[in-house]
Amino acid sequence: MPRLARPAGAAAATLALGLVAAVPATAHEPLVTDARVLTHLDLAAGQTPENIALDLDGSADVTFAYARQIAHVTDDGRVRTRATLPAVAHAATPLLHSAVVTGIARAHDGTLYVDYATGTSATGVWRLSPGDAPEQIAALPADGLPNGLALDERRGVLYVADSVRGTVWRVPQAGGTATAWAKGAALAPLQSAPARGLGANGVKVRRDSVWVSNTDRGTLLRIPVRPDGAAGPVETRAGGLAGIDDFAFPGHGRSVLAALNTGNRVVLVRADGTVTTVLTAQDGLSNPTSVAVRGRTVYVPSAASTTRRDPNLLLARLRHLIGR
């Protein structure tokens, strides 16, 4: 999640309100091993990675939120800017008060899609086709905060998690009008402490369902996709995930690797709701924002949003894929 425009004391108080007690990984067989920082990023230059999409060759594309950039990170850690989204005069993004690039998704042909939150008419989904400049393909409400982004190429749609409006938007992959696909209390931010104003955050498509994290509520949600494309009832799959940001599936089942931003942890949330910590600040995490998995390699960007030290991209290895 991007750094909120709040006093440091309030942020510290939020963190102090308690982190979920997780089941420790066994000392003899940790699920995630060989953690290393692939590249250390430049905080002063605005290189604070908010989200990640993987390329076929093992490299990655990340969003640098406040720099408004889409950057490419090679498999040996070199960083180059793919594109910078246009500056916006008088940006008024809710909670953040600045224009930020948040979620990112990659199509099979290399086209990238990102969320751009500005508090203006530029808020929405933008497309970056290979060799082209970024272009807006769908508008979203200026008073919202589009955050996570997921692509379902089979249905030809994108899903956007709006953290302020507590809504999952559905956008045609080719561009067009966004529709409110799912909303309600389970997706909304809290209205009282320990509220940060962030509801629906990360989003992923998994077979015939859309999974969403809710940061304020510390929950992981599943929303079935009905045969006509409409949203089914929201199911809570896990709770107690304080500071949850974005997440990924480390196998073919319903287990999830989730970034707990404020707790500097990545946890495994199994299908039965049990939680195990698999990576911590000792491994190099510094406000992790998202997780991606390709094969048995785990990618975790850290934005250093409150630690204010060492934004980075960390790699680790799964001992095995998770089948449940």
Predicted regions mapped to residue ranges:
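Secretory targeting and sorting signals
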Residues: 1-28
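Beta-propeller fold detector
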Residues: 34-41, 79-87, 135-139, 178-186, ...
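Beta-rich, blade/repeat-based domains predominating
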Residues: 43-60, 88-115, 140-158, 186-209, ...
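Beta-propeller domains
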Residues: 62-84
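Short loop/turn segments immediately following the C-termini of beta-strands
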Residues: 65, 117-119, 163-164, 173, ...
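A short loop-to-beta-strand structural motif that recurs across blades of beta-propeller domains
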Residues: 69-71, 124-126, 167-170, 219-221, ...
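Short loop/turn segments that connect beta-strands within beta-propeller blades
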Residues: 73-78, 128-133, 172-176, 224-229, ...
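Asp-box/WD-like beta-propeller blade repeats and closely related beta-sheet repeat scaffolds
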Residues: 119-153
